Amino acid sequence: MIAQKSVRDYIRTIPDFPHDGILFRDVTTLFQDPRGFRLAVDQLLSPFVGETIDAVAGLEARGFILGGAVAHQLSKGFVSVRKKGKLPAATIEQAYKLEYGEAVVEIHDDAVQPGDKVLIVDDLLATGGTAEAGIKLIERLGAEVIGCAFVIDLPDLGGRAKVEAMGVPVHAICAYDGL
């Protein structure tokens, strides 16, 4: 009997990228394999089965790939949370802190409606800054974030605690300690 692969088995680890001492978790190998990709989408959704979800929001950039697949599976709309200046219509924006400085993400000001229930999807939860900004944007439009789903959690960087402190449940398929 052939053992079933886990999502973790499809993720490649690249040492010293983008800097010395970093172990980069590369999910592109997960996306390249149809079995791995399907497994990841199914597992991202599993804790939210039975929940009302009106839209799926993906965080730039790999969250677009995963979030789009999740939205398709649910037959729901997809919302892009993008870096500032990339969306063509009227937007709202939210700044968040980086290690050195600040970044800004935005969504269209009509991306969700008041009362909508939104699931946020991304590949990786590290410090939680981008997820926090995405949650704030969606809530500013009057919608509710019912959860955040990630392929990978890096718990040592504190992102889960930051998102959960906002009252938003976090689901991650796998976790990696350290950097």
Swiss-Prot record:
This is Adenine phosphoribosyltransferase. GO terms for cellular component: cytoplasm. CDD domains: PRTases_typeI. Pathway: Purine metabolism; AMP biosynthesis via salvage pathway; AMP from adenine: step 1/1. Disulfide bonds: none annotated. Belongs to the purine/pyrimidine phosphoribosyltransferase family. It is found in: Cytoplasm. InterPro entries: Ade_phspho_trans (IPR005764), PRibTrfase_dom (IPR000836), PRTase-like (IPR029057), UPRTase/APRTase (IPR050054). GO terms for molecular function: adenine binding; adenine phosphoribosyltransferase activity; AMP binding. It is an enzyme of class 2 (transferase). SUPFAM superfamilies: PRTase-like. GO terms for biological process: adenine salvage; AMP salvage; purine ribonucleoside salvage. Its main location: cytoplasm. It catalyses: AMP + diphosphate = 5-phospho-alpha-D-ribose 1-diphosphate + adenine. PROSITE patterns: PUR_PYR_PR_TRANSFER (PS00103). It holds the Pfam family Pribosyltran. Gene3D superfamilies: 3.40.50.2020. PANTHER family: ADENINE PHOSPHORIBOSYLTRANSFERASE. Signal peptide: none annotated. Keywords: Cytoplasm, Glycosyltransferase, Purine salvage, Transferase. The keyword Oxidoreductase does not apply. Homodimer. Its EC number is 2.4.2.7. Catalyzes a salvage reaction resulting in the formation of AMP, that is energically less costly than de novo synthesis.
